[in-house]
């Protein structure tokens, strides 16, 4: 969301419950510098996520096992570390049970979706659809964001506007049905 300048929308979405683990915070520090994002964006993200959650000694074995399952031959040693750490912390920490896991990594999404402690797994396009359904952005703005992500070589799915439209329309329909059941 930072690359799209949508951090304030992500803040609204997480409702002061955003959290991150130490490895994800480290990845943020590296990408923050690489993307040359403003320090204001860094402050927003840090305020939204709070202090990084540090794994304890008991977490490391599970993190390593999950990371090994996620990595492919030839992947860097740190590949999927942040995702594995996040999933294990959600699994092992009662206060994190029911969390929404945010990632565009398809392998991590598969593992998170199979984790009973994870409520939902959302990627960038799903978040944008939630923002649209909430009335925080328009569909045209989202289409422009999808183009910007493609131009920045970000791999998000769906990336085509018509596929996004179908997903957003489905979400809107589900939300309307859910509100009728209340």
Predicted regions: what they are:
Residues 1-100, 106-182:
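Active-site-proximal, substrate-binding regions of enzyme catalytic domains
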